[in-house]
Amino acid sequence: MQDLNALLERSLGQLGYELVDMELANRGKLIRLFIDKPEGINIDDCVLVSNHLSNLLAVEHDIDYDRLEISSPGLDRVLKKTSDFVRFAGERAQVKLRMPIEGRKNFLGILRGVDQEYLVLECDGVEQRVPFSNIDKARLSPEF
C-alpha cells in the first residue's frame, strides 16, 4: 500500500493535485481517492485524474483493482499532514486522540497552528498542545 500511495502522490503531484486521502474497500478491489488543489476541484478535475490514473494503473501490473473513484475531500475533509493543519489554521476541527489528555480523547476547536511536533488547538478559549503522534483522526468541522 505504501508503494501505491507513493506512486499516486508522485503522479498527482505532477498534475498539480494533492492526494488528501486514500481508501481501499472490497478487499482492495475498490480504490477511492480524495484529491485537492489550492483553488479547489470540480468534476472536470475528477475526470482528468480518473483517466490519467486508470492508464497509469493499467501499466502497473502488480496493482489489482476493479474500480477507481475520484472525489473532492469535501467541506469536512480529513487532516493528515502537518501542512494540512497549517493550511487550515483558523478553521474549526474535530480531533480524536489515541491517548487522552486531561481525561478527554475528543476535541472540537479552532486550529491555531503548529508548534514543532504539536498541533495548537483552541477549545473553549483554552489552547491545547496536542502531539501529532497522539492524533488518531482529525477533520474539519465547518459550521453551517
Curated annotation (Swiss-Prot):
Which GO terms of type biological process are on file? ribosomal small subunit assembly; translation
Give the main localization category: cytoplasm
UniProt KW keywords? Cytoplasm, Ribosome biogenesis
The superkingdom of the source organism is Bacteria
Q: Where in the cell is it found?
A: Cytoplasm
Q: Which SUPFAM superfamilies match?
A: YhbC-like, C-terminal domain, YhbC-like, N-terminal domain
Q: Name a Pfam family for this protein.
A: RimP_N
Write out the GO cellular component annotations.
cytosol
Signal peptide positions on this chain: none
**Which NCBIfam families does the entry link to?**
PRK00092.2-1
Q: Which family does it belong to?
A: Belongs to the RimP family.
Biological role stated in the UniProt entry: Required for maturation of 30S ribosomal subunits.
Q: What is this protein called?
A: Ribosome maturation factor RimP
What gene name is listed for this protein? rimP
